[in-house]
Structure formats: C-alpha cells, structure tokens
Amino acid sequence: MSDYLSVSALTKYIKYKFDQDPHLQSVLIKGELSNFKKHSSGHLYFNVKDKESVISAMMFKGSASKLNFEPKEGDEVLLEARVSVFERRGNYQIYVNKMQLDGIGNLYQKLEALKKKLTEEGCFDKANKKSIPKFPKKIAVLTASTGAAIRDIHSTINSRFPLAEQIQISTLVQGEKAKDDIIEKIEYADSLGVDTIIVGRGGGSIEDLWNFNEEAVVRAIYNCKTPIISAVGHETDFTLSDFAADIRAATPTQAAVIATPDQYELLQQIQQYQFTLTRFIKKHLEQQRKHIEHLSSYYKFKQPTLLYDQQIQRRDDLEKRLKQQIQATFEQQRHRLMLLQQRYNLKALLSSVNQEQQNNLQLTNQLVKLLNSKILSYKNDLKNKVENLNNLSPTNTMLRGYAIVNKKDEVITSTKDLTENDQLTLTMKDGLVDAKVTKVRCNND
C-alpha cells in the first residue's frame, strides 16, 4: 500500500513540477475572455479560450488595479501569466500579472485615452471653432494625389463654385510616413493665406485611418489658423481629427459642399434680388411722378413769387433773432467774466486766510512743544525735590532702624538733657515704646 499516492500528494507533486519549471513562470498568452467575474475582493476570475481550448485564470487585486481598461466578456487580450496548479480542484490555471487588449481592441483603448486627454485640454470645444467663409477665393485640398477623394472634391467645387481657386496639396494619408507628412502639409497650407482647408481621404479600417488619430496630427489641426473641414473616411468613420476640425464632413463630396456656395442657388438669389429691386424702383418712380404732378397743381407754383416771399420774411426774422441772440450771449459772457473776477479776488483772500491759518497752526505747535518741554522740566525738578524730602523724612529715617526720643512731649536730641530715672517715649516705625533711663553716658565720658 505504501506504493500508492494519495490524490493530494500527487496534486502537490504536480504543482511542485509546475512551480519549478522556469518556462512556466512567465508565459505570454493570447486569447478571448469568457466567464468573466469580478469578485467583491477586487480579484478577477475568468477563462481564456481560443477555438480549441480553455484555461482557467485569475488576476489578483494588486495587478487588476493597474489595468488601464475595464475587461469584459469577449475581449481579445494579450496576457503575461504564471502557470500553476490549483490544489483543491487538481486542475492547472494561470495567474495573470499583466493584461492588455489585443490588436484593434488596443487601438480603441489608445483612442479613448487620447480622446479623453484632448477633451480635457479643450481641443474639441465648440467655442474654439472657426466659421467657414461663405464665398472662398482659395481652397487648399490636402489628400492623396490619386483616388476618389480628390476627384469628388475637385468636381464638386467646379460644379458648385468655379470662381474658387483650388490648390491641390498632395499628401500621404496612409503608412508610417503619413503622420509627419500630414502635419507638414497642414502647416504649409496654413501659411498660404487660403480661405479654407479641406483635409480628407477615402474610407478604410481603423488601422488605415489611424494617422488621423495621432496626437500630433490632431494638435496641428487644432492649432491651424485657417478654418479646416475634416473629410476622413466614410459617413460611419470617425477620427479625432474630425473633433479637432472646425467642421466635420461625412464624405469628401460633402466637404466640398460645405466649403462652397451653389452657383445656381446664388444665380437664383441674384435674379430674385434683381426682380425685387426693379419692382421697388418702378413703384418708387411712380410715387414720385404722382407727387410731382400733385405739386405742379399747387397754387404757389402758379405764382412763383409766393414761393420766396415768405422765405425772405423768415430770413429777416431769423437775422433779427440771431442779432438778439448774439447780444444776449455777449451780455451773459460779460456777466460771467465779472463773476469769475470776483471769484478770483475771493480765492486770493481765501488763500491769504489759509496762509495765516497755517502760520497760526505752526506757532501753536511750537508753543505746545515749548509748554510740554517746560512741564516735563518742572515734573523732573519736583520729582527730585520729593525724593530729597523723602530722604530727610523722619519716617524714612526710622525705616533704617532709628527712633525719636520724647520726654514729656519734647524731642530729646542730646544726652545732656537726660538724667537717671527719666521716663521716655520712643517712637519707632511700627509703634511707641515707654522706657526709663537707668544710666546716662556722654561721648566724652
């Protein structure tokens, strides 16, 4: 029985073999996500399959948090993983460290990330869009030198508005060198002083149109000072260049329509304006003719002197009023001049008063300073005298340990005034002391 292995022992041995194999520690796998689940813990559980096989897989929260897209059922992905055995079930599975979308999916991922970035910078804001001129003199067309796009644009402009000069700028629209060529041609067209630029090409896959999703191309369109019409691909195709351009056309033909007016519509408008103007002129002339006929029947035209008699009288009246007005204006200005002269004299008087006030204020300030100086001197002198008095005060003397000796209300200043058995009163700093003389000693004894 010792030769038989338990299921768990065999599973552990197989897991050991997997974990020790260096070729299984970092494996690159391509496949489709299925049975995708995101656990509440943040771990991802899913299968990776192709047409023939399915592998169980998981991705820990730490690795999943670094993903720059949201995985979902059916995504074609590229994985970097470690192969091991899940002992509980006894089946092998992969532990994914890195995941990215495969092929077109990865392109769409890059497209969305760049679109978000440029949107946040304001490159697609409607407020920055320039209007397309209604009657362009020159139109620059940036597209491939051959193909349906240039033919459609050229024929449409010629049929709609042949007055517009077309400047064809042959441009690479596909391939590795196309990006730099598109940018160079946009900057060149912008320097020509044209009215409108059409940037276009025919339809294709996302890979074919990818140059018009390149950040540098989008920024070149956004920074262009000349209005740009984007006509990249078919109606269902969208590129970031469409969002950066001043207007997006579904097709190259529509771009030519947007860029030009229709000559036949313009001709109809001109004919309509001509008809309206002619009708207006005829009506106005008829009204003026009737007005002249009416005036010619007026009685004053039959007696011409009546036309200017009143005007002569009115002229004389105006002349009189003008003279009166001149005289009144003269008197008004003379009166104003007198007032100004009086005001000037008053101003001079006020100026003199102000000067005296300034002088008085200056003298007052000087007097205040002098008084303050004297007061300060008196204060300092008084302070010194108070200090001297305090020094001579008996109270201050007693504070230093001395006492005042009284005998029958007389102050004793000499031992000669004392005899034995005299009753004395000693005044000290904090009270009185009664004392009796027991012996008298003089300094010369």
UniProtKB/Swiss-Prot annotation:
GO biological process, one term: DNA catabolic process
Listed InterPro entries: Exonuc_VII_L, Exonuc_VII_lsu_C, OB-fold_nuc-bd_dom
Disulfide bonds: none
Keyword Ligase found: no
Any matching Pfam family: Exonuc_VII_L
UniProt KW keywords: Cytoplasm, Exonuclease, Hydrolase, Nuclease
Record-level GO cellular component terms: cytoplasm; exodeoxyribonuclease VII complex
Similarity-based family: Belongs to the XseA family.
Function: Bidirectionally degrades single-stranded DNA into large acid-insoluble oligonucleotides, which are then degraded further into small acid-soluble oligonucleotides.
HAMAP family in UniProt: Exonuc_7_L
UniProt subunit comment: Heterooligomer composed of large and small subunits.
Record's protein name: Exodeoxyribonuclease 7 large subunit
